[in-house]
Amino acid sequence: MRSRSAILLASLASLPLSTLAEEKTGAEVYETVCSECHSTGKHDAPVFGDRKRWGKLVREGLNDLVPAALRGVRKMPAMGGNPTLTDLEVARGVIHMANAGGGKFAEPTAADAARWRKKADAGKKH
């Protein structure tokens, strides 16, 4: 029994970390990170579900919204203040909030996240 446990642990240790941990959904990212400010409007963050505030942001589009969330904007820190999130998870969180505010955005792809990261890295926090 002990040797089976050792083999199992050794096998798990050899897997990439991304295989061991499932990525969060947009709703999970919102609940665990974004809701701290976006549920109450802390620091003038647009409140989840506020179609008037989010409507303006939705019109800007994901090519502006996601890079801003990745690099940080105004009082919002980069990655929503949680550097353990992946770029794809941040994008999912943004899309979850934008869709609750009237957007109709689809699930992002890894290619989308890579493109948005490149744009975020090219810009500065504003």
Regions found by a protein language model. Name each.
Residues 16-21:
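N-terminal signal peptide c-region/cleavage motif recognized by signal peptidases
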Residues 39-68, 77-80:
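Gly/Gly-Pro-rich "capping" loops immediately C-terminal to redox-active cysteine motifs
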Residues 31-40, 93, 97:
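The canonical Cys-X-X-Cys-His
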